Amino acid sequence: MDKNKHILIGICGGIASYKSVYIVSSLVKLGYKVKVIMTQNATKFITPLTLETISKNKIITNLWDLDHNEVEHIKIAKWAHLILVIPATYNTISKIASGIADDALTTIISASTAPTYFAIAMNNIMYSNPILKENIKKLKTYNYKFIEPDKGFLACSSNALGRLKNEDKIIKIILNEFNQKDYLKNKKILITASRTEELIDPIRYFSNTSTGKMGFCLAQEAVKLGAQVTIITGPTNENDPEGVNIIKIKTAMEMYKEALKIYNKFEIIIGAAAVADFKPKHIFNSKIKKNKINRLYIKLVKNPDIIQHIGHNKLKNQIVIGFCAENSKNLIQKAKEKLKKKNLDFIIANELKYFGSKLNKVYIINKQSIKELPEMEKSEVAKEILKILY
């Protein structure tokens, strides 16, 4: 644990503000250097003197507390190795998402490149507001991180989603951020992701419901661990992960050709794409008119199996990981068969029902063992999968 890290705590105005005292106190006791910014509304719930005593630093409550001769807001933004906003309110989240910097907290966040966490706490109706959801989604694309609230009793007397996550869990999340190591430093990883689209005519195609989220989570987490990542992706609505070289394709053949051109340059290949098994043998030159056809027969031909080709042609020190999606009844058996048939080092087995979901439940399988993971967010699944590489 690196005790030389600096943590900036931003406290917003909400009934959960008082819980920040425990978090600041705990981080100081652990040896971290902690500074606190409070919004004006936060000072209505808890006194700055309390936080000043605990943090052993002057509390900033507005821009005029800063020494402008030193461009202090920039100095503090650079000082922070991590920013935690707690409780993150509807107002503050929305201001940051809109690029508004009208107080000390929003100004410093706007000038910082440090990992920034928003620990959300608010009324359940406010939390479900679509405007807030869009703002959170927007901020996530810029790598802001969110500690989602729990269900519990709220200030409005409702028992609903919106209660600040347990303080010890928040502290654990912060410590995990600092404890990340470059376990995959300079490792070259190739990942295939999302679905492919096989044209029937100029506007219609065969495809599936894969979103690419699992592959993109793997790419993002691998970058955090120091890897050099290239992702070959089919169509997706996922945001491009930062620090990743991205190759975009549409069809299975395009993915196959791109993968074969470069896979021997990588130490690790992960086939997370849901590649179409078949494609139309012929593509209609123009849109098919239903008024001219009573029955339509389309002859299909097999697409090449990308990960199988790589598995059987891998270099001596390459690790090849595949994915297998099946119904739960035959999942493990089918995965074992594919592991052997495709000459893979590992295969990740998951049920079909998780296609298009933010969650996943997988089994990590190799020749010697089967590791079952509980249902969890795909970003967490990605972390667990990557652990097999170090």
UniProtKB/Swiss-Prot annotation:
<comment type="pathway">
    <text>Cofactor biosynthesis; coenzyme A biosynthesis; CoA from (R)-pantothenate: step 2/5.</text>
</comment>
<dbReference type="InterPro" id="IPR005252">
    <property type="entry name" value="CoaBC"/>
</dbReference>
<keyword id="KW-0456">Lyase</keyword>
<feature type="binding site">
    <location>
        <position position="287"/>
    </location>
    <ligand>
        <name>CTP</name>
    </ligand>
</feature>
<dbReference type="Pfam" id="PF04127">
    <property type="entry name" value="DFP"/>
</dbReference>
<comment type="similarity">
    <text>In the N-terminal section; belongs to the HFCD (homo-oligomeric flavin containing Cys decarboxylase) superfamily.</text>
</comment>
<feature type="binding site">
    <location>
        <position position="277"/>
    </location>
    <ligand>
        <name>CTP</name>
    </ligand>
</feature>
<feature type="binding site">
    <location>
        <begin position="304"/>
        <end position="307"/>
    </location>
    <ligand>
        <name>CTP</name>
    </ligand>
</feature>
<feature type="active site" description="Proton donor">
    <location>
        <position position="156"/>
    </location>
</feature>
<feature type="binding site">
    <location>
        <position position="323"/>
    </location>
    <ligand>
        <name>CTP</name>
    </ligand>
</feature>
<keyword id="KW-0511">Multifunctional enzyme</keyword>
<dbReference type="GO" id="GO:0004633">
    <property type="term" value="F:phosphopantothenoylcysteine decarboxylase activity"/>
</dbReference>
<dbReference type="Pfam" id="PF02441">
    <property type="entry name" value="Flavoprotein"/>
</dbReference>
<dbReference type="InterPro" id="IPR035929">
    <property type="entry name" value="CoaB-like_sf"/>
</dbReference>
<dbReference type="GO" id="GO:0071513">
    <property type="term" value="C:phosphopantothenoylcysteine decarboxylase complex"/>
</dbReference>
<dbReference type="GO" id="GO:0010181">
    <property type="term" value="F:FMN binding"/>
</dbReference>
<comment type="function">
    <text>Catalyzes two sequential steps in the biosynthesis of coenzyme A. In the first step cysteine is conjugated to 4'-phosphopantothenate to form 4-phosphopantothenoylcysteine. In the second step the latter compound is decarboxylated to form 4'-phosphopantotheine.</text>
</comment>
<keyword id="KW-0285">Flavoprotein</keyword>
<comment type="pathway">
    <text>Cofactor biosynthesis; coenzyme A biosynthesis; CoA from (R)-pantothenate: step 3/5.</text>
</comment>
<feature type="binding site">
    <location>
        <position position="342"/>
    </location>
    <ligand>
        <name>CTP</name>
    </ligand>
</feature>
<feature type="region of interest" description="Phosphopantothenoylcysteine decarboxylase">
    <location>
        <begin position="1"/>
        <end position="188"/>
    </location>
</feature>
<dbReference type="InterPro" id="IPR003382">
    <property type="entry name" value="Flavoprotein"/>
</dbReference>
<comment type="similarity">
    <text>In the C-terminal section; belongs to the PPC synthetase family.</text>
</comment>
<dbReference type="GO" id="GO:0015937">
    <property type="term" value="P:coenzyme A biosynthetic process"/>
</dbReference>
<keyword id="KW-0436">Ligase</keyword>
<keyword id="KW-0479">Metal-binding</keyword>
<protein>
    <recommendedName>
        <fullName>Coenzyme A biosynthesis bifunctional protein CoaBC</fullName>
        <ecNumber>4.1.1.36</ecNumber>
        <ecNumber>6.3.2.5</ecNumber>
    </recommendedName>
</protein>
<keyword id="KW-0288">FMN</keyword>
<dbReference type="InterPro" id="IPR007085">
    <property type="entry name" value="DNA/pantothenate-metab_flavo_C"/>
</dbReference>
<feature type="region of interest" description="Phosphopantothenate--cysteine ligase">
    <location>
        <begin position="189"/>
        <end position="390"/>
    </location>
</feature>
<dbReference type="GO" id="GO:0004632">
    <property type="term" value="F:phosphopantothenate--cysteine ligase activity"/>
</dbReference>
<dbReference type="GO" id="GO:0015941">
    <property type="term" value="P:pantothenate catabolic process"/>
</dbReference>
<dbReference type="InterPro" id="IPR036551">
    <property type="entry name" value="Flavin_trans-like"/>
</dbReference>
<feature type="binding site">
    <location>
        <position position="338"/>
    </location>
    <ligand>
        <name>CTP</name>
    </ligand>
</feature>
<dbReference type="GO" id="GO:0046872">
    <property type="term" value="F:metal ion binding"/>
</dbReference>
<keyword id="KW-0460">Magnesium</keyword>
<keyword id="KW-0210">Decarboxylase</keyword>
